Structure formats: C-alpha cells, structure tokens
Regions:
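A short beta-strand-loop structural module common to alpha/beta enzyme folds
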Residues: 10-21
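Proline-aspartate-enriched helix->loop->beta-strand connector
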Residues: 35-44, 73
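Charged helix-capping and loop-helix junction motifs
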Residues: 54-64, 99-105
Length: 165
C-alpha cells in the first residue's frame, strides 16, 4: 500500500511481514515518541495463523490502542478490518483454514474502535465474496496476499482517510 501512495512523503510503513499483535506492541515506543498525526493499524492475520482466538487478538489490539492513546493522545488512529482469506488455493493453510476467525475479529474490532474513539475502516466487505465469506479470487492468487488490483482497491478505500485533515 505504501508504494501505491507515492505522493505522501511523510508516510512511513512500519509493517513487518509475518508480524503479530505483540510484535507491533513491542515496537510502538519509537513510533509514538514521534507523535505521528495518524496511525493506520492493520494487524491480526498472522495471529490467526498461530491459532490465537479472536478474543485474544482483540485484547492485544486493545493494548496497542491504549498505548498509542496514552503516549500520543493527539494521534488520530485508524483501525482497519482484517482482510478475508481464501482456502481454495491450498496455500498458507494456517491462515486460510481459519477464515471464519477473520469475521469474528472484525465483528469485535469495530465496537473496539468506537469505544476507543478510533476510526474504523471496513476493508473486509470490499474484498469478501458475499456467497462464500472468503476473499474474492480477483484480488489474490494464493488466498492470503493481495494482487496489484487488490492493493489499488485498498489504496482507494484508505486514501480519503489519509487525505483527511
């Protein structure tokens, strides 16, 4: 997504491939010390692959949110829903075989955002096939990672929030 928004010179991508909620939490100090204007958080799918429950993932996201609010109270926080996955490819089975957990996380994430005064960005409904509850194959070729078309859709969804003053 960072590469799809090249005109934003002050945007920093702090995502790490394979990261989990507590990995984000443990790396927050230098980020919040910089008092960023905005933080866009999308985390949880790798926790799913480790067998972590939706409730535990939400608890850990809540810890992240509280730390950001405490250490950088003026930072506007955007919680992005976890993207759907699709198990039809036979790849990334730790993630894709637990596709129902993603919906459970998102059902809990939106109320968390409201409770904590964060904005909630619903990515899930744009990427999911309504009939199956799984990621639309138009956006992936492995059931987990986005193709270019998926990144462009994500960019189009997030851009208004990036542009917001």
């Amino acid at each position: 997504l960072h590469d799809a928004l090249p005109i934003y010179k002050n945007v920093k991508n702090r995502g790490i491939s394979g990261d989990i909620c507590m990995g984000v939490y443990d790396r927050l100090d230098p980020i919040v010390k910089g008092k960023p204007a905005k933080i866009f958080l999308l985390i949880g799918i790798n926790d799913v692959s480790r067998g972590t429950s939706a409730d535990k993932i939400i608890s850990e996201i809540s810890m992240i949110v509280r730390k950001i609010k405490q250490e950088s109270p003026k930072t506007k926080l955007y919680l992005q829903s976890v993207l759907p996955v699709n198990d039809c490819y036979g790849m990334f089975n730790g993630h894709t075989s637990r596709w129902q957990v993603v919906k459970q996380i998102n059902d809990l994430l939106e109320p968390l955002a409201v409770k904590e005064g964060a904005a909630y960005i619903d990515l899930y409904s744009h990427f999911v096939e309504k009939e199956t509850g799984k990621m639309n194959p138009v956006y992936t070729n492995d059931g987990l990672h986005l193709l270019g078309k998926g990144y462009l859709l994500w960019r189009d969804i997030v851009k208004p929030y990036v542009d917001q003053k």
